[in-house]
């Protein structure tokens, strides 16, 4: 690809991850809602609404990325994220908050699988796809460090209040949108827009043409638009059909997605419930933010360490991560806040240790044409597991 600087593209993707996930309001949304007077039951229902909306949007958003292009889909994701924050600022009751939460889920869905697909295809376009292992590890580490840093700012977000906190998220969302616009699209997608035109020039030219030429040109323009619409429709159909056949005939991919979702759901919910259990276990509330930050560093470490074991069989990752998550789950019942924090650290480490390897494995298995769609199927599987596990673990813990 001419004039394509792969290093610049990858660095922009790293920067995008760093900017996108520094959301001080998003990282402390539970505490902000509680501060506004919402009950834990209402917050739990809103969490379910997020995952239900996510499960509805996940696969269609992947199809959109495969059909219209990764860059456009990422730009739409950032725009929807900004609108979600704006909706949260304007919300004044449970219904409007639920609407904002659903919009937030759509933003995550549009990004899920898309940034990974763009990174992989960028490297593949210059025959450097073997470097995706290192990219995935570093990207996951940046995501965890950034999101953990945002969590560390939870006290600051509460001090600011939800409106100012979400305004800061909007600011970083606009920066992220600017970064997306500077990215290079890789694959030759057929878009929905045509060539740019100058209306005044077109009108002047038409006046000098004969009526026959005008009619012929209009017919050609109409035919081109019809062909474009047919191509988009066919691409939607082909992506969905081929993705379905891939999942139906690839038992290994299905198994990988399910196991990854189960381990990831347990780890995620352990961290979620520790936000409530740590203060009850005697941890000073002022230390809650730093405690969550430390646990998040476990995930960053797990994402980075996985790069040192590229030749391990996938079963080894499953066994090690499974043991780590089970230990984390057990430590939440110790009653000792420091053991619980250690458990959260271990669980986060195990989760991302498996997650990064799963991402690499699936990208190697998936055809480029359906990459975003099938990675979205992976996220969809996680959402379904979360809907069930949230209630189950909530009753146990």
Put a short name on every predicted segment:
Residues 1-7, 186-257:
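Juxtamembrane intracellular "pre-TM" segments in multi-pass secondary transporters
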Residues 2-55, 250-293:
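Helix-loop boundary and gating motifs at the non-cytosolic
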Residues 18, 95-111, 339-353:
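Hydrophobic core of transmembrane alpha-helices in multi-pass small-molecule transporters
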Residues 35, 147-168, 279-281, 386-397:
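Transmembrane alpha-helix termini and helix-breaking/packing motifs in multi-pass membrane transporters
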Residues 46-47, 56, 71-74, 272-397:
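C-terminal transmembrane bundle of multi-pass solute transporters/carriers
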Residues 79-92, 323-335:
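C-terminal ends and interior cores of transmembrane alpha-helices
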Residues 102-143:
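Cytoplasmic helix-loop-helix junction between adjacent transmembrane helices
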Residues 165-182:
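Symmetry-related core transmembrane helices of the 12-TM Major Facilitator Superfamily/SLC fold
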